[in-house]
């Protein structure tokens, strides 16, 4: 355990087999599993197993492949890295999801992060129903934008002004253009395995689906769009210093995931973020935290509150839309005032700030303000992660992993894992077998070893116990 300056809490270092972090949570915290976000559903994980079948999913996916490239609208959903039949989802509620074959799963994907208070929360749905009565999109300002903007600005240390967009990719595209406009410099530094969306400059040595499919980069990205993207291994300060030395006066910004969630779950070494902050200041470059995953998940103020490091600019997404399409970028006022129409840096969007996304975001953030929220996430995620690692040790598998609050990950590798190169040494074939086995046991993890997992306020200790028991059963079988 190592204290984080300015936060007043402890955070677990990378877990390996046999290491058990002290879970730091308030005595008798409020149970953060609201009755409004849970329902009683007959679950395959809660009752004697019926025969597991994906026949309807198989039929639907076969048809989908004739209609959409690969049968999906985002590559990782196709199960390429884990094998087997992709599941077609019919409904979600609380911590559970049900496919069209009637199988139910404890869900640790959470729509890739947004569902931090649980799926289809009753309070959020009720608020959306009221908002929809007034219309779904105005293409003009609405008061809800002010409300959510005030909430984001008050929560995130770096943000003095914010611009809402429609996705995390869009947020990263906008913030990159802004950094170049503000500094007058062309180059950016990103880290190997970090994923900042599918825009051309960010797909150089990217994580997420690019890593899942084993692609070095993506075809179609012209050299003109990628030649100013410099890369370094995550957690490697000397590599960053060398890039600044080689490209003096040319680097506009460093952009990074403060905790990597798209190349496995990789935590920053204790001095890494502080050193990056120091280097950018010394070189008059901007520091950008991509908090699309970590924002409002590691703490109400995101990773920057958790670690006590304040960047110049921040991107957000996922949670701030409560499950609806959304993104945002924000930061220092003097930088943000360059964004049109206040300044010359142009960026626009038809559906940006639409009332539905604003409503869902407002009511999700309100729920996160409740007492004991992040202590509860820390508790259940710690139990889950350590339980899986203990099961791996008990059954003779080399595994490593870690967690922070409501975000976690594990790899079939000895560890430690400090960067993408370390993560790629993991046993992806074994993970595929583990993954398929867990599906049959009614547990849904991300269908790639290189994607972080997420817990929610709707997950219960019973969910965790069932998951750990299922993991031990499957690990024995493989």
From Swiss-Prot:
EC number: 5.4.3.8
Pathway the protein acts in: Porphyrin-containing compound metabolism; protoporphyrin-IX biosynthesis; 5-aminolevulinate from L-glutamyl-tRNA(Glu): step 2/2; Porphyrin-containing compound metabolism; chlorophyll biosynthesis
Ranges in a coiled coil: none
Organism: Nicotiana tabacum (Common tobacco)
Subcellular location: Plastid, Chloroplast
Modification type N6-(pyridoxal phosphate)lysine: residues: 318
GO MF annotation list: glutamate-1-semialdehyde 2,1-aminomutase activity; pyridoxal phosphate binding; transaminase activity
Full protein name: Glutamate-1-semialdehyde 2,1-aminomutase, chloroplastic
SUPFAM superfamilies registered for this protein in UniProt: PLP-dependent transferases (SSF53383)
EC class name: isomerase
UniProt-listed PANTHER family: GLUTAMATE-1-SEMIALDEHYDE 2,1-AMINOMUTASE, GLUTAMATE-1-SEMIALDEHYDE 2,1-AMINOMUTASE 1, CHLOROPLASTIC-RELATED
Enzymatic reactions: (S)-4-amino-5-oxopentanoate = 5-aminolevulinate
Cofactor(s) needed for function: pyridoxal 5'-phosphate
Lineage of the organism: Eukaryota, Viridiplantae, Streptophyta, Embryophyta, Tracheophyta
Keywords: Chlorophyll biosynthesis, Chloroplast, Isomerase, Plastid, Porphyrin biosynthesis, Pyridoxal phosphate, Transit peptide
Gene Ontology BP terms: chlorophyll biosynthetic process; protoporphyrinogen IX biosynthetic process
InterPro entries per the UniProt record, alphabetical: 4pyrrol_synth_GluAld_NH2Trfase, Aminotrans_3, Aminotrans_3_PPA_site, PyrdxlP-dep_Trfase, PyrdxlP-dep_Trfase_major, PyrdxlP-dep_Trfase_small
Subunit structure: Homodimer.
Keyword Cell membrane part of the UniProt annotation: no
A GO CC annotation given for this chain: chloroplast
Family: Belongs to the class-III pyridoxal-phosphate-dependent aminotransferase family. HemL subfamily.
Database matches in Pfam families: Aminotran_3
Keyword Isomerase recorded: yes
């Amino acid at each position: 355990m190592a204290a984080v300056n300015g936060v007043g809490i402890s955070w677990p270092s990378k877990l390996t087999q046999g290491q058990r972090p002290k879970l730091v949570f308030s005595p008798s915290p409020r149970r953060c599993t609201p009755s409004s976000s849970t329902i009683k559903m007959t679950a395959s994980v809660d009752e004697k197993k019926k025969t597991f079948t994906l026949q309807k999913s198989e039929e639907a996916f076969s048809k989908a492949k004739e209609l959409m490239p690969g049968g999906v609208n985002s590559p990782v959903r196709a199960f390429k890295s884990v094998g087997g039949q992709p599941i077609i989802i019919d409904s979600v509620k609380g911590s559970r999801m049900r496919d069209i074959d009637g199988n139910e799963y404890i869900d640790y994907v959470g729509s890739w992060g947004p569902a931090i208070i649980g799926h289809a929360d009753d309070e959020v749905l009720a608020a959306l129903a009221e908002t929809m009565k007034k219309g779904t999109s105005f293409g003009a300002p609405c008061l809800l934008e002010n409300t959510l903007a005030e909430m984001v600005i008050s929560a995130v240390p770096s943000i003095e002004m914010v611009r809402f967009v429609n996705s995390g990719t869009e947020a990263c595209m906008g913030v990159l253009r802004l950094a170049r406009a503000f500094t007058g410099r062309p180059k950016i530094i990103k880290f190997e395995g970090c994923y900042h969306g599918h825009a051309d400059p960010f797909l150089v040595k990217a994580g997420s689906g690019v890593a899942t499919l084993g692609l070095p980069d993506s075809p179609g990205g012209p050299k003109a769009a990628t030649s100013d993207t410099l890369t370094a291994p995550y957690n490697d300060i000397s590599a960053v210093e060398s890039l600044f030395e080689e490209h003096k006066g040319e680097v506009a910004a460093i952009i990074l995931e403060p905790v990597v969630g798209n190349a496995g779950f990789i935590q920053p070494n204790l001095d890494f973020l502080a050193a990056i902050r120091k280097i950018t200041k010394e070189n008059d470059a901007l520091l950008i935290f991509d908090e699309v995953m970590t924002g409002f998940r590691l703490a109400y103020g995101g990773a920057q509150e958790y670690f006590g490091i304040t960047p110049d600019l921040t991107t957000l997404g996922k949670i701030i839309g409560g499950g609806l399409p959304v993104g945002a970028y924000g930061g220092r006022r003097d930088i943000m005032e360059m964004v049109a129409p206040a300044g010359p840096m142009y960026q626009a969007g038809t559906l940006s700030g639409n009332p539905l996304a604003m409503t869902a975001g407002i009511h999700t953030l309100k729920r996160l303000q409740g007492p004991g929220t992040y202590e509860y996430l820390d508790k259940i995620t710690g139990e889950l992660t350590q339980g899986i690692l203990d099961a791996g040790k008990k059954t003779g598998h080399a595994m490593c992993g870690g967690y922070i609050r409501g975000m976690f990950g594990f790899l079939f590798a000895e560890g430690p894992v400090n960067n993408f190169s370390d993560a790629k040494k993991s046993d992806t074939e074994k993970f595929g077998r583990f993954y398929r086995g867990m599906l049959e046991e009614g547990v849904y993890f991300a269908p790639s070893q290189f994607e972080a997992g997420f817990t929610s306020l709707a997950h219960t200790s019973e969910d965790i116990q069932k998951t750990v028991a299922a993991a031990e059963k499957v690990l024995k079988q493989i």
